[in-house]
Amino acid sequence: MNEVRYYQKNIMIVDDDPDIVLSLQELFEREGFQVTTAENGRTCLVELEKGFQGIIILDLMMPIMDGIETIKKMTIDGFTDENTIIVLTAKRIQGEEFNEIYPYIADYITKPFDISTLLNTVKKIAQKPPVKRRY
């Protein structure tokens, strides 16, 4: 049986809902991923400054620093070059606000979400070697 190879094994879950964070952490750890968590954008940036590289599952509606502001700051600091962002949020955005973040995200999944859709999205991304992107 062929074992699936994951090039990106690190996942950061950035969400202020502890139930979602715990559920996703347990799911991805069972799948063999190393999971880091952050309760808002500011904490996410701290983890990135410590050297986190991988897949970031990011909510847009959070206190202290929301997801859109986090993506903007990640772009300025160069963190979008080596990390893959999946937006997972109840916030529906469009127009200019969406256009600002679209170039930097791999997928946009709305809450409530199907767990298998998120898991399959993460697995597809993780199976690809990381690409250093320049925007």
Predicted regions and their residues:
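Helix N-cap/capping motif at the beta->alpha junctions
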Residues: 37-46, 67
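Alpha4 helix (beta4-alpha4-beta5 surface) of REC/receiver domains from two-component response regulators
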Residues: 69, 81, 92-109, 116, ...
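Non-catalytic signal-transmission and effector/linker regions of two-component phosphorelay proteins
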Residues: 1-12, 116-135
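Charged docking surfaces used in two-component/phosphorelay signaling
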Residues: 22-30
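Receiver (REC) domain active-site loop signature in two-component systems and cognate sites
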Residues: 62
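Hydrophobic/aromatic residues positioned on beta-strands within the core alpha/beta folds
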Residues: 88-89
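Active-site beta3 strand of CheY-like receiver
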Residues: 52-57
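Short amphipathic alpha-helix used as the core "switch/output" element in two-component signaling
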Residues: 46, 68-81
